[in-house]
Amino acid sequence: IPYNPQSQGVVESMNKELKKIIGQVRDQAEHLKTAVQMAVFIHNFKRKGGIGGYSAGERIIDIIATDIQTKELQKQITKIQNFRVYYRDSRDPIWKGPAKLLWKGEGAVVIQDNSDIKVVPRRKVKIIRDYGKQMAGDDCVASRQDED
């Protein structure tokens, strides 16, 4: 282990804190091993303070939960990026679009049409997968003629 005086101070501070907690809980535990486990638990989950008033254990759990939520949201975003939306406004029978799908919920979708962001009921929306330019009509016709 490389010499690092700052980390040595952190370790010494933690040892001092754990010794203090062990002194408080020693009479409640039959074995020293149990007292050490109790002290570590108390230090990680019961002592609040620092960032946001969380305990150390709550902070790490919050970090992990946030990371999982971020990954799930990124998955959902990549799923709906390739969709185009055609929609109708109120009583106007003419379909408008294509607009970019931002969010798809149970009863409504959020779309971006030019710079406008709108919430439209699902019943007034047609969601179509955008296959990109490789499926454009002229290219398909040309490739089919080449196959014959």
Swiss-Prot record:
The known PTMs are summarized as: Specific enzymatic cleavages by the viral protease yield mature proteins.
Q: Where does Mg(2+) bind?
A: 12
Which Pfam family is one of those matched by this entry? IN_DBD_C
Keyword Transmembrane helix annotated? no
Q: What is its EC number?
A: 2.7.7.-, 3.1.-.-
InterPro entries cross-referenced by the UniProt entry = Integrase_C_dom_sf_retrovir, Integrase_C_retrovir, Integrase_cat-core, RNaseH-like_sf, RNaseH_sf
Q: Which SUPFAM superfamilies match?
A: DNA-binding domain of retroviral integrase, Ribonuclease H-like
Biological processes, Gene Ontology terms: DNA integration; DNA recombination; establishment of integrated proviral latency; symbiont entry into host cell; symbiont-mediated suppression of host gene expression; viral genome integration into host DNA
* Gene3D superfamilies in alphabetical order: Integrase, C-terminal domain superfamily, retroviral, Ribonuclease H-like superfamily/Ribonuclease H
Q: Name the source's superkingdom.
A: Viruses
Molecular function terms, GO-annotated: DNA binding; endonuclease activity; lipid binding; metal ion binding; nucleotidyltransferase activity
- Positions of the DNA-binding region: 83-130
What does the UniProt keyword field contain? AIDS, DNA integration, DNA recombination, DNA-binding, Endonuclease, Eukaryotic host gene expression shutoff by virus, Eukaryotic host translation shutoff by virus, Host gene expression shutoff by virus, Host-virus interaction, Hydrolase, Lipid-binding, Magnesium, Metal-binding, Nuclease, Nucleotidyltransferase, Transferase, Viral genome integration, Virus entry into host cell
Residue ranges crossing the lipid bilayer per the database entry: none
Q: Where is the Integrase catalytic domain?
A: 1-64
Q: What is this protein called?
A: Gag-Pol polyprotein
| Encoding gene per record | gag-pol
